[in-house]
Amino acid sequence: MTDRSLIANAMADVEAQYGDLNDEVYALLFETYPEYLDLFLLDYDGGVRRNMLRTSLEIITNYAEGGDVVNRLEGARLSHFTYEVSDEIFDQFFDIIEQVVATKLAAQWTREHRQAWQDMQAAFTATAS
């Protein structure tokens, strides 16, 4: 298995076993970074949160399947710029997703998975301006 296929398989396993991770991801995000809750004050129905997670998962999946995600990442970063979301804050969302995925997969999540995720995040961070 390549590093990217570890991510692809992990994401497929989590989706098959647990479905929607929206509640878990945002619970951990706001527990870890309570100050980020203010960024979602106008998200009355959770649509922004669902869209943000869906976009992030699509980026992860595209990367894991060998796709080029540079334009998608740059576009997502740019759309967050108007909300004063720095590249560092933007990248932290992928940390949160990893923590949820690793927790869900428990013993299935190995050092190799962790390294593959770190490599992916390094590639994502490299797209920051």
Q: Which stretches of residues belong to each language-model region?
A:
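Globin-like tetrapyrrole-binding proteins
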Residues: M1-S129
